Amino acid sequence: MRIEEDIKLGFKDVLIRPKRSTLKSRSEVNLIRCFSFKYSTMKWFGIPLIAANMDTIGTFRMAEALSKFNILTAVHKYYSFDEWKNFISVSSKEILEHVIVSIGTSNLDFFKIKKIFSLSSELKYICIDVANGYSEHFVSFLKKIRSFFPDKIICAGNVVTGEMVEELILSGADIVKVGIGPGSVCTTRLKTGIGYPQLSAIIECADAAHGLNGQIISDGGCTVSGDIAKAFGGGADFVMLGGMFAGHTECLGEIIQEKSKKFMLFYGMSSTSAMKRYTGKIPGYRASEGKIVKIPFRGNVDVTVRDILGGLRSSCTYVGAQKLKELTKRTTFIRVSEQENCIFNNFKN
């Protein structure tokens, strides 16, 4: 047993210090980034936000909607091959170029990903997604995928420490997904006692990844656009969002009508609801590590996306970053004990 004495920080523990700026307007900020990758020879241009590969969020409809904003969608791994075949047959090149295909680490996943990628050359991204990226089996599977898909852009996770980021990049990952337990419907930290404050995980993992010409995705913990700015400020190359995209028309959550209001169910992928939906039961060796929540139905995702992008542009303006790429260099975090004035938080419109 050992104790690390240095303080680890989450998004709620800091604010970004404003700095002098030559920018006159938010409209001058460019959120588009261009990435090249360690293994894949492909390049990517776009806004580096990703809809999470949860079954209610990472849907085909979400991919169609977000592609219009040049934003990626990590499509969940529970669609059948026939559903993929139908989606690819009716989708444009622009949509498919913004799709990340998610898989697990079983032999069935390996056969399925080969079949899916045989359908279209426009698919570029693979996300090998497990809750715990620290297993030797996971690393071995990553090497297998890289060997079979030498030129695809591969992201793998989740992990939260620099040494494992380095291990995954050296094993074939272009991008490493960072985050254990920060999600809005994740209870892993409570159930297991395992985790890492997200901002510190980003800072440490980005340092490790960038030293090897890799990138990271910050996965989880963002509740407002200011948190997204903090993630980019801490060194994240991409930011993955689940809860912030929940409750929209493009999601697959069950809609509940209560009097005159609509709500949508949103749950974690290790929750009782998810396990029963895809395996029929909770395996005897497992415990639920997610929760189910009922959130107000929010309509089309377009409005939420514009609000997020507007907040991100404003963050860049406050620190004088004309490009999103410059935000990390322009960021100075200050530790705080409060984030907002809460006097009217209990008042409703």
From Swiss-Prot:
State the reactions this protein catalyses: IMP + NH4(+) + NADP(+) = GMP + NADPH + 2 H(+)
Which residues are named in the active-site annotation?
186
Residues where NADP(+) binds: 108-131, 216-239
So what EC number does this one have?
1.7.1.7
Self-association or partners: how does it assemble? Homotetramer.
Query: Domain of life of the organism in this record?
Result: Bacteria
Say if the entry is tagged with keyword Metal-binding.
yes
- The species this protein belongs to is Buchnera aphidicola subsp. Schizaphis graminum (strain Sg)
* Sequence similarity: Belongs to the IMPDH/GMPR family. GuaC type 1 subfamily.
Question: Know the name of this protein?
Answer: GMP reductase
